[in-house]
């Protein structure tokens, strides 16, 4: 999830200076490994057959047709380990030890690819048009952003593909010098160690 988020933020950070991040991630069950995939499949099958004897070994609640705001262990302060990992890893990769970050990580009944809703505030003013230009030459990310024609990233668009997709780019209505955006990527492909190294090399 961190890598997918960073892919959406780094092109903008390099030009406008990242100041703070508010994010909500919608994480596929493949983030829990094969066991998560099987649990979702088993629950969907059971419910389609009218059975209520759902297996719940991986997640504390039914994941089929549900969302669970609980990814990894809860820590002191009410944040999960995954949420704190996003904060700490994001600061480390971007080399911004004082970056203000808050996030909520949610497990969703999608097999593959994580999605992240991000509000990012910058040191310098930035327009939607300037953001699009910043993404143009950045490797590994592609803009899909024409909401009027129902064009925006979805998990299915990125499954088993290397590129992350960004869309719903708009100026935030609350924070100054801020953009809201939607980033989606196959965490298995983009979240691999190789891609983490590639991102570090681009900073």
Question: Where are the regions a protein language model picked out?
Answer:
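Active-site-lining helix/loop region of Rossmann-like oxidoreductase modules
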Residues: 3-134
């Amino acid at each position: 999830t961190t890598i997918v988020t960073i892919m959406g933020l780094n092109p903008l950070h390099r030009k406008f200076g990242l100041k703070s991040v508010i994010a909500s991630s919608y994480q596929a069950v493949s983030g829990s490994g094969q066991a998560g995939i099987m649990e979702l499949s088993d629950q969907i099958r059971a419910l389609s057959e009218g059975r209520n004897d759902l297996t719940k070994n991986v997640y504390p609640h039914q994941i089929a047709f549900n969302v669970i705001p609980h990814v990894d262990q809860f820590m002191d302060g009410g944040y999960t380990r995954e949420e704190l990992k996003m904060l700490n890893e994001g600061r480390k990769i971007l080399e911004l030890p004082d970056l203000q970050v808050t996030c909520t990580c949610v497990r969703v009944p999608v097999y593959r690819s994580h999605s992240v809703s991000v509000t990012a505030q910058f040191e310098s003013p930035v327009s939607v048009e300037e953001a699009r230009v910043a993404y143009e030459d950045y490797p590994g990310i592609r803009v899909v952003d024409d909401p009027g024609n129902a064009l925006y990233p979805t998990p299915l668009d990125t499954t088993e593909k290397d590129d992350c997709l960004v869309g719903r780019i708009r100026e935030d209505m609350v924070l100054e010098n801020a953009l809201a955006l939607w980033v989606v990527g196959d965490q298995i492909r983009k979240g691999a160690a190789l891609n983490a190294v590639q991102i570090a090399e681009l900073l």
